[in-house]
Amino acid sequence: MKIILSNRKPSESNHIWVSDISSIDLFVDDSESTEIIIDSMLTSFPYIELGSVLSKTVSKLRVNGRIIIYEKDIDMICHHYNKMGMGVQDINDLLFDTSGSIASVLNIETIVDRLKELGLTIEEQFINSETMQSIITARRSNNEN
């Protein structure tokens, strides 16, 4: 079973769309999903809740299942604002374009650290400098904490 967590309806037809993470238990049991995609949804939670949100999501992954996270990177946004002449309107467009309400900002290191704390193996991490989006792929192994 493949899941996509997103505020906007995805074009992926082979994934089950969950638009409200609090309802994920209705769609998938623990250790059932082979792949979970989180598309610009983590910032809709307060920063202090990031660990618990990721923990609940990761609990839905099978052993060897993977999670892919797309999230705007605040470090890259600040860099563009400072060095590239990005304006305040540009930042507002980036942060509030499709994410709905925003309760926190994140960078790639924060997300990677939380995933590692949950016992996941990071397979890939990079920042798309054009979209200023962190892209992280991690896998749940069978030797978790």
PLM-predicted stretches and their roles:
Residues 5-7, 39-40, 61:
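Short His-Asn-centered micro-motif
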